[in-house]
């Protein structure tokens, strides 16, 4: 999809690209392979979170978003805001697969002087905000959506954030503003994987979906590792007008690699090369 096709780009009753579930699952697998390559070259990283949201990223970048990798600053592009900047490996993999990034940059991921840092920077083509300090992505996404409205631009803004991040009060201030202004071109995707830096979540934020509903958001909760459910959530929310939208994703950190799925301290993975080789093999063995 390029900027030359923008005048027939908005079909409110359908996706940007109508890919089937099998194609989307293959895209998700390729994202996981790409992330594993990047993490094993580095020897460490936030790989578990990236694997957990791979299915969502496959749907968003291959079915939902309108963008032009040859023109990253195209004003009419849909915007994907990664609030959890440490999930950068997932976004870089998606941008590479979408044609934004050259392959050689993947091999330098996270190294000193690399274009692709462990946390996102907005000087990378396709990266909309600089990440790092949590709790700020949704507010920036709200600002983008308001700016689009002022410009009579019907582009969408999709913001990914995490369950741990919901402990930040700024998230709920932003949610309140979005509801007040009826920003129905804004979608929040909340990755609920149950982990924080040192292990499981330390503050109970449940019921997550009910909170977003109470703030006036049209909300759907799904299995975040089930592509069929993710697609159905986007299709259902597409018909909701006059309210911002939220998808609550229940994901498994390390999805697709049983060793990582069972790892309690999965926030930051650091293992030897032999174990990386085993993890690569597990990923291929568990692909169905």
Regions found by a protein language model. Give the residues of each.
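Glycine-rich beta-alpha junction loops
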Residues: 55, 86-87, 193-194, 226, ...
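Glycine/aspartate-rich loop-and-adjacent alpha/beta segment that forms the canonical ThDP
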Residues: 4-7, 227-288
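Structural motif
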Residues: 43-51
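N-terminal capping segment at the start of a domain
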Residues: 28-44, 191-192
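Short secondary-structure boundary/capping segments
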Residues: 98, 204, 261-265
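Cofactor-binding active-site loop characterized by glycine-rich and histidine/acidic residues
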Residues: 38, 51-180
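N-terminal hydrophobic or amphipathic helices/low-complexity stretches enriched
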Residues: 2-31
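Thiamine diphosphate
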Residues: 126, 130-241
